[in-house]
């Protein structure tokens, strides 16, 4: 189980590298697991049996590959400790684009890419570069709080391929 996960993680890291190269060769993002020892199948079964009552009570499984801890590195430094808000946002978006590409390659299906408040915390240069990267991704849904901000990044609301849905909140005093 961990071996399969390791192979998928390596494939995903390669996809992240490709996306980063398309975005900008100066940026590298790497994901590494911080789980010290990978148990054998027998170790896992033993721990599952040992924790079964706790798992049932908590309604979740406490052991397994889904509990591995990961560290995201941005320019070879742990993002959590050293990354600015813009670097966090940029890393998140690049990881989502890589995830989209990875799923597309693994399943031969083109998933919808959903990016919430895409341009927040990104300067115009980074925002435009991200938009250029996702432009050919297929169906993409981008939420944003400001239509002007979207236009500043090269998204034309009058393009028939784009659909802008403007939501208004009805304020009552």
Region annotations inferred by a language model:
Residues 3-112, 121-125, 129-141, 148-155, ...:
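Conserved NTPase motor "head" modules and their coupling/switch loops across ABC/AAA+ ATPases, GTPases
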Residues 116-118:
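Walker B catalytic acidic pair
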Residues 158-172:
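H-loop (His-switch) and adjacent beta-strand-loop-beta switch element
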């Amino acid at each position: 189980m961990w071996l399969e996960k390791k192979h998928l993680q390596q494939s995903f890291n390669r996809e992240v590298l490709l996306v980063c190269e398309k975005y900008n060769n100066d940026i590298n993002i790497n994901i590494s697991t911080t789980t010290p020892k990978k148990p054998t199948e027998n170790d896992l079964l033993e721990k599952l049996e040992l924790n079964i009552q706790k798992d049932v009570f908590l309604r979740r499984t406490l052991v397994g590959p889904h509990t591995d801890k990961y560290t995201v590195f941005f320019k070879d430094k742990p993002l959590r400790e050293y990354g600015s808000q813009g670097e966090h946002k940029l890393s998140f978006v690049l990881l989502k684009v890589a995830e989209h590409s990875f799923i597309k390659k693994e399943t031969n299906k083109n998933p919808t890419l959903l990016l919430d408040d895409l341009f927040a915390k990104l300067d115009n240069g980074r925002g435009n570069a991200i938009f250029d990267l996702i432009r050919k991704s297929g169906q993409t849904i981008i939420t944003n709080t400001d239509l002007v901000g979207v236009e500043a990044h090269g998204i034309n609301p009058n393009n028939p391929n784009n659909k802008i849905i403007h939501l208004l909140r009805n304020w009552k005093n």
